Swiss-Prot record:
Disulfide bonding pattern of the chain: none
Species of the source: Bowiea volubilis
Function, as annotated: Usually encoded in the trnK tRNA gene intron. Probably assists in splicing its own and other chloroplast group II introns.
One Gene Ontology molecular-function label: RNA binding
Protein name listed in UniProt: Maturase K
Keywords (A to Z) from UniProt: Chloroplast, mRNA processing, Plastid, RNA-binding, tRNA processing
Amino acid sequence: MKEFQGYLEKDRSRQQHLLYPLLFQEYIYALAHDHGLNGSIFSEPVEVFGYDNKSSLALVKRLITRIYQQNYLIISVNDSNQNGFVGDNRFFYSHFYSQMISESFAIIVEIPFSPRLVSDFKEKEIPKYHNLRSIHSIFPFLEDKLSHLNYVSDILIPHPIHMEISVQILQCWIQDIPFLHSLRFFLHEYHNSNSLLVTQKKSIHVFLKENKRLFQFLYNSYVFECEFLLVFTRKQSSYLRLTSFGTFLERTLFYGKIEYFICRNYFHRTLWFFKEPFMHYVRYQGKAILASKGTHLMMKKWKYHFVNFWQYYFHFWTQPYRXHINQLSNSFFYFLGYLSXLLRNSSAVRNQMLENSFLIDTVTKKFDTIVPVIFLIGSLSKAKFCTVSGHPISKPIWADLSDSDILDRFGRICRNLSHYHSGSSKKQGLYQIKYILQLSCARTLARKHKSTVRTFLRRLGSELLEEFFMEEEQVLSLIFPQTTPFTLHGSHRERIWYLDIICINDLVNHS
């Protein structure tokens, strides 16, 4: 740990050039083992094979020796392909090494982007309270901002990303060529391995539950690059007109191209480039929304800007259907588990002035959120709580549990959904979801006791289930440490929100 801290205290520019030697340091793999492998599936096989901490250190030394020999990846892949059962030591070695290398790459690649990591090792007093910024803080923000806007674009960020593109993104910040070559070789050799979440097309897919730290970092760097270039092109070229935005896509020569085109085109031409001061961008998971006060033509230009941007810069063949343009006053858009829209309420006020009277029509806008019943029923059907049409069914996999455990599981899901969607203006959809869960719980208990639902409820009493589902659980207040995100291209002065609490229940995340 002291060696690792001393390395971090060096100049940041030197860190970017000296990442490759860290692959041969034992303390890096010790950190990787403590961070990623203690709570993973590899902690159990170590005990099965009779390895302790000293034996794990011997495995690390053997891994470093293989790295020196430059054939550790090929050997690991061959071992994992030939031995497909956990009882084989070679199978365990190959997967242990692959997981260890993946975690080590993740730790090393995060070093240039963690300038404040050194201060985290120092003992300091932790403040008792922080201002939490949860997903629910988005809705007051949207209610305040969207009431003045006209259109919103629902954008699906393209995925999966190609491994070569992710390595090229890292080349903008990391100048250690041997380290990048090792990372590229590691990703390409393991694109078909089951131990790493990489698809057969050599693309990183991060929307799976069991995710690795390295691939999460690569995806986050890709999203950060998209957002940075979006802000960069909008700020630096907002005064350019009748100039193709594809010309200014390469940011390394951006200022030179601006100077060249301005000098060549100094005539009085109407120059513009998506200039829109009233614009808001919000991203969550793999989706984003772009709201604007501009016209429908302006939103279509932004739509095709994104399509060409992903095509020419990230080599994505993106279809236009990934970005939907909706008018806020006429349609709903799905965001963070809610169907949101902008309602217009008109009212007439009679004004009397002396002998004359006249009517004043006032229009007020209200940001409305309703429960997406269809999406929630689809999620419940995938979890085997009901059919696709919303008919409650029993949960056979829970029939072996005790009655209290069954009630507790159903009640926890119901209360979580109730807490999350309690801010909706219309509660009928929420009551329908609660009824489906309540009847599914009753069918599961009746299946366990080999009885009908009516007989079971008559014997147990319907009031018990009713009181159980109506009982409010005390909400736990979570305190998260305040973290400052790394600034890859310098600090942004835009008001960008980084949320601490991002999810409350898996059923909120719809595909």
